[in-house]
Amino acid sequence: MILISGYLDYRPEECDEVVAGLVEVSKRSLEDAGCVDYWWAADLETPGRFRFFECWESEEKFAAHRSQPYEVEFMERYVNNRAIGADAWAYDPSSRRSAMDD
């Protein structure tokens, strides 16, 4: 399993168009083989910042996702050519358990 988290920053006046792109990439990503979870959320304290979280069954499934044409297009259009700030981190958890257990 691999977890990815991070953020992308945009100019506030671009956010409506960016949200449309985030909705589309989310829908398609959730359909990819090996996608356990995938979401975006507007940062409540930083205007124009969107945080993301992804969970994939394996590094291989994540790599396959990154090579999908829609993902390549998203990265080019909304990250490489539009984001004014960005960072992301990958985590490789060694175990998984419920955080709701007593």
Map each language-model feature to its residues.
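Short, well-ordered beta-strand segments in beta-rich or mixed alpha/beta enzyme
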Residues: I2-D9, W39-R66
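N-terminal first-folded block
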Residues: I2-D32, V36, W40
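An amphipathic, aromatic/His-enriched active-site/gating alpha helix that lines ligand/cofactor pockets
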Residues: E24-V36, C55-W89
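Glycine-rich beta-strand-turn "strand-cap" elements at beta-sheet edges
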Residues: A41-T46, M75-D102
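Non-catalytic surface loops within mature trypsin-like serine protease
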Residues: Y10-P12, S58, D92-S94
